[in-house]
Amino acid sequence: MIYEGKAITVKALESGIVELKFDLKGESVNKFNRLTLNELRQAVDTIKADASIKGVIVSSGKDVFIVGADITEFVDNFKLPDAELVAGNLEANKIFSDFEDLNVPTVAAINGIALGGGLEMCLAADFRVMSATAKIGLPEVKLGIYPGFGGTVRLPRLIGADNAIEWIAAGKENRAEDALKVGAVDAVVAPDKLAEAALNLIKGAISGEFDYKAKRQPKLEKLKLNAIEQMMSFETAKGFVAGQAGPNYPAPVEAIKTIQKAANFGRDKALEVEAAGFVKLAKTSAAQSLIGLFLNDQELKKKAKAYDEIARDVKQAAVLGAGIMGGGIAYQSASKGTPILMKDINEHGIEQGLAEAAKLLVGRVDKGRMTAAKMAEVLNGIRPTLSYGDFGHVDLVVEAVVENPKVKQAVLAEVEAQVKDDTILASNTSTISISLLAKALKRPENFVGMHFFNPVHMMPLVEVIRGEKSSELAVATTVAYAKKMGKNPIVVNDCPGFLVNRVLFPYFGGFAKLVSAGVDFVRIDKVMEKFGWPMGPAYLMDVVGIDTGHHGRDVMAEGFPDRMKDDRRSAIDALYEAKRLGQKNGKGFYAYEADKKGKQKKVADPSVHEVLAPVIYEQREVSDEDIINWMMIALCLETVRCLEDGIVETAAEADMGLVYGIGFPPFRGGALRYIDSIGVAEFVALADKYADLGPLYHPTAKLREMAKNGQSFFG
C-alpha cells in the first residue's frame, strides 16, 4: 500500500500503475468532506513524489463513485468571511489542479453516480471511462450555488460552452450514452468491464498510443471561442436560462456569467473567477434556504427510515372509493410494485378510477418513460371490485371516500369487519380528526390517517396522522408503504387540518380579509406569484375547489374558533353560494376554457365582481408588502403553533411539509426558515403591526421569548 487513509487509499496494481481509490469508512457513499480533501492532498503529494509511478487510475470502493461535497459542512463554511471562503475554495482547487498536473497519465473509472465534486474529480483526470449504467452531473444549482471545484472551468473546455451551460444550468443527471455523445467521457463499457477498460486505457496512455498531454492541454487554456461566438453563445443562454429559472434562482445565470468571464483565461485564473462567483452565491438567501431544504429532506428521510425496524411489509393493498383520487392512489401503488384492490359501490366509480390510472399510464408510455408491456403489468396490479370478497388477504386499506365524517365512519366500520385482525386502516382525509373517526372502530390501534395531496402522482408529500389510539406499528407500516409508493411521508399528530391544511387555511384567511378590504384578487395573485408561490391564492382556491375550500374552512373554524372563525360572509361564501366552484365547473374567481390540447386555461371573468361586491366591506389602501404580510404572517404563525403544540416534531418537518404539500417557495426554505431569514425579533415586531387583523396575527408567548433571547429555529 503506497498510501492509506480513512477515505482514500493508493495501491500498486502492475507495471508502475497505481489505483487511487475513494472508499470513505463508515459511510455508504463517498463524499468530499474535509477529511477526504485532506487525504486527497496527501495522496496526490505521495504520487507526485514517487518516480516509479507511471499512471494513475481513480476508482471507487463503493457502489457509487462520489456523490459530491458533504453538504452538512456548507452551513458553517458559508458563514465564513468572503475572503476566507474564497481562499478555502482556491486551496481545495489547488489539490485538483495538482492532480491534473501530475507528470503521468490519469484515468477515472466511473461507476454508479458521479455528481458535483465527484464529476469535477473526474474532469481533472486525463481520460474518463464510464459504466453503461452510471450517471454523471453537476446538480449544484439545485442548492442555489454552482460547481466550485473547477466544474465551470473544465467542463466547457472539454465539451464546449453550449453543452456545459446546458449541463450546469439544468443540474440534471446525465446517462452514459449522453455523456459519451458530447465528449464528457471517452468510453462507455459494461459495468463488469469497467476495471479492465480503465487498465487498458492507462496502459495505452503510458505506451504513447493515447496522447494524454494533448488530451489535458485544452483544459489548461482559454475557451476556443472568438468574441462573436462568445457573445452569441453566452448572451442567448443567459436570456433563455433567466426566463426558465426566474429571478428568485440566480445560480444558473451566475454560472453562465462565470463561464463567460473566465472564457479568455487559462485554468488557474479561470478558477479564481469561479471562486469569486461561488462565494457570491453562497452568501445569498436562496442558497442558504435551498441548502437548508436539502438538509431537512435528509433528516426527513432518516426519520422515515427509522420506522423500517418495526414496519410490516404491505404486500397487498386496497383503496375504498375509486374515482379520480382512488384511481390516483391505485396507480401510484401498482406502478411502484404493490398490487391493489380498488373498491367502489358502483360501476361508474370503478370506471372513473380505472380511467384515471389508464390516463396516467398512457401519458408515461407516450413520453417514452414506460413500455406498453410495463403499462399492462401495472394495470394488472389494479383489481377493481364492487365487493369485499378478496379483502381477507389485504395488509393495508386506504379509505378515500367523500370528506364527510359520518360516511367515513360507516365505511371504515364496514371494512374493519371484512379484513384480518392486524390489517391497517388508513383514512385519506384532509381535515377530519383521526381520533374522531376511530370511535367507529373496534381496533382503533390499527387506524391512522394517510393524507395524499392532489394530484396524487405529482405531489410528493403524504401526511401520516397518528390518532390518540394509533399504534406505532400502524404508523410505521403506513410510513413504509408511503415510501414504497415513492412518496415523502411526514408523521404528524392529530388535530383539525393536521399540519398542511391547518397552516394553509390561515393563509386563505389572510386572502379573504384582503378581498373584503377591497383588494383585487388578480393583484393579490400577481403579488404572491412574484413572491415565489407557484400560483396565487385565488387561482389555488379555484384549483382546489371552492366547495372543498368552503368545507375545509368550516372544519378549521370549528376546530380553532378563537382565531379561524369569522362571522362575516367572505369571498369563499359568495362564490360557493353562486355555485362558482372553480376549475371543476368552469367558474370560480376566474373562468376556465379548454385550450387546443384540452387543458383548462384560466381567463378573466368580469361577472365575478358582481358576485364579490356584497363581501367587500371597505376600500383600504394596501401596499404589495402589506399583501405579502397579511398572508404570510398568518401562515407562519400557525406553523409556529403547530410546532409548539407538538403536531409536528421538528422545524425541519414543518418546513418540508409546506414545501412538498402546498408549494411553499423552495428558495425561501419554508415558513420557519422564512421567519429566521427576517429574524425572529423582527418578525414578531412585524406581526405586531398587523395585530388589529385578529388573533391569527398575534405571536405566541414562546415566540416572543425566542425573540427576546435572540433564538432562531435553525441555528
Swiss-Prot record:
- The record's active-site residues are H451 (for 3-hydroxyacyl-coa dehydrogenase activity)
Q: Name one GO molecular function term.
A: 3-hydroxybutyryl-CoA epimerase activity
Protein's GO biological process: fatty acid beta-oxidation
Entry keyword set: Fatty acid metabolism, Isomerase, Lipid degradation, Lipid metabolism, Lyase, Multifunctional enzyme, NAD, Oxidoreductase
Reaction(s) catalysed by this chain, per the record, are: a (3S)-3-hydroxyacyl-CoA + NAD(+) = a 3-oxoacyl-CoA + NADH + H(+); a (3S)-3-hydroxyacyl-CoA = a (2E)-enoyl-CoA + H2O; a 4-saturated-(3S)-3-hydroxyacyl-CoA = a (3E)-enoyl-CoA + H2O; (3S)-3-hydroxybutanoyl-CoA = (3R)-3-hydroxybutanoyl-CoA
Binding positions for substrate?
A: D297, N501, Y660
- Give the EC number(s) listed in the UniProt record: 4.2.1.17, 5.1.2.3, 5.3.3.8, 1.1.1.35
Which pathway does it operate in?
Lipid metabolism; fatty acid beta-oxidation
Instruction: Spell out the residues of the site Important for catalytic activity.
Output: E120, E140
Q: Which InterPro entries match?
A: 3-OHacyl-CoA_DH_CS (IPR006180), 3-OHacyl-CoA_DH_NAD-bd (IPR006176), 3HC_DH_C (IPR006108), 6-PGluconate_DH-like_C_sf (IPR008927), ClpP/crotonase-like_dom_sf (IPR029045), Enoyl-CoA_hyd/isom_CS (IPR018376), Enoyl-CoA_hydra/iso (IPR001753), FA_oxidation_alpha_subunit (IPR050136)
Q: Name one GO cellular component term.
A: fatty acid beta-oxidation multienzyme complex
Residues that hold NAD(+) according to the record: M325, D344, V401, V402, E403, K408, S430, N454
- What PROSITE patterns does the record point to? 3HCDH, ENOYL_COA_HYDRATASE
Superkingdom field:
Bacteria
Enoyl-CoA hydratase/isomerase, as annotated region = 1-190
Extract the coiled-coil ranges from the record: none
Region ranges (3-hydroxyacyl-CoA dehydrogenase): 312-715
Q: What does this protein do?
A: Involved in the aerobic and anaerobic degradation of long-chain fatty acids via beta-oxidation cycle. Catalyzes the formation of 3-oxoacyl-CoA from enoyl-CoA via L-3-hydroxyacyl-CoA. It can also use D-3-hydroxyacyl-CoA and cis-3-enoyl-CoA as substrate.
**Which NCBIfam families does the UniProt record give?**
FadB, PRK11730.1
Which HAMAP family has this protein been placed in? Answer: FadB
Its subunit composition reads: Heterotetramer of two alpha chains (FadB) and two beta chains (FadA).
Q: Which PANTHER family match?
A: TRIFUNCTIONAL ENZYME SUBUNIT ALPHA, TRIFUNCTIONAL ENZYME SUBUNIT ALPHA, MITOCHONDRIAL
Q: Which family does it belong to?
A: In the N-terminal section; belongs to the enoyl-CoA hydratase/isomerase family.
What's the name of the protein? Fatty acid oxidation complex subunit alpha
**Organism source for this protein?**
Pseudomonas fluorescens (strain SBW25)
Q: Report which gene this protein is encoded by.
A: fadB
